């Protein structure tokens, strides 16, 4: 792609490419401004942008770079733009990234990925009231010892699906390891008894290959509304979990920010 911009002002160049990109409906909406900024030298390339195939919901991924060539009077004369299709490599890299963020058994976020996502969310929403739930399966070792680890794994997978079903799509569910899970509830109200009761009261919906298995969970909950980090809020919620354990299990304990 070669565009002659001789004697055009920067404003004219900007408007020209803004119109061009805005009218190119196949480019992802959130990527259009990057292309405009690249051509007007507001950012350096290469950039990555996504573009739908015409008449299809499938898309390709491309890199785009632009170089401005100046004449002897130091006036911008030509923009040379080069694009390369990196769709296959991009999807492979994205797939590997997704795998690195997920627990291999339950496909929930693993601790490292979940911790990072929660910390970033709190930084961006420091005044919002959120809650962290730490939970585990009561007497999970007995399930493994009695029925075997395959059944134990089946229970972990079923509980992971259960937690996803009974939380909002924007909430974050993490498998910490073993039988311990974390649920991060975004933008909650003061009264958390309803969501906690919902999680506790529908466990009988979980069906396993061994129908005779009965289990319960214990939960610790911490709600807060200022900027904190995952390690701090996890410690408080984890303390609440152990309070539930000392109170006989199959219950939850809520701690509120002081």
Predicted regions and their residues:
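Conserved long alpha-helical elements within nucleotide-processing catalytic cores of c-di-GMP signaling
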Residues: 97-101, 110-131, 138-168, 174-178, ...
């Amino acid at each position: 792609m070669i565009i002659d911009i001789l004697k055009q002002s920067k404003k004219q160049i900007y408007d020209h490419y803004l119109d061009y990109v805005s009218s190119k409906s196949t480019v992802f909406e959130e990527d259009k401004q990057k292309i405009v900024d690249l051509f007007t030298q507001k950012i350096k390339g290469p950039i990555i942008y996504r573009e739908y195939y015409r008449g299809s919901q499938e898309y390709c991924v491309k890199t785009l770079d632009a170089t401005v060539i100046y004449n002897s009077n130091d006036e911008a004369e030509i923009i040379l733009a080069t694009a390369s299709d990196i769709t296959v490599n991009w999807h492979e890299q994205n797939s590997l990234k997704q795998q690195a963020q997920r627990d291999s058994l339950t496909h929930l976020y693993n601790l490292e990925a979940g911790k990072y996502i929660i910390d970033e969310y709190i930084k961006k929403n420091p005044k919002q009231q959120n809650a962290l739930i730490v939970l585990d399966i009561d007497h999970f070792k007995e399930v493994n010892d009695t029925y075997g680890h395959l059944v134990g794994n089946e229970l972990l997978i079923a509980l992971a699906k259960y937690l996803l079903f009974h939380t909002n799509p924007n909430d974050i569910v993490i498998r910490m390891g073993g039988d311990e899970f974390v649920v991060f509830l975004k933008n909650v109200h003061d009264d958390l008894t309803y969501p906690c009761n919902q999680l506790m009261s529908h466990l009988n919906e979980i069906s396993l290959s061994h129908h005779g298995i009965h289990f319960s969970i214990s939960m610790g909950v911490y709600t807060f509304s200022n900027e904190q980090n995952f390690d701090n809020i996890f410690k408080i919620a984890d303390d609440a979990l152990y309070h539930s354990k000392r109170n006989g299990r199959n219950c939850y304990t809520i701690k509120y920010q002081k």
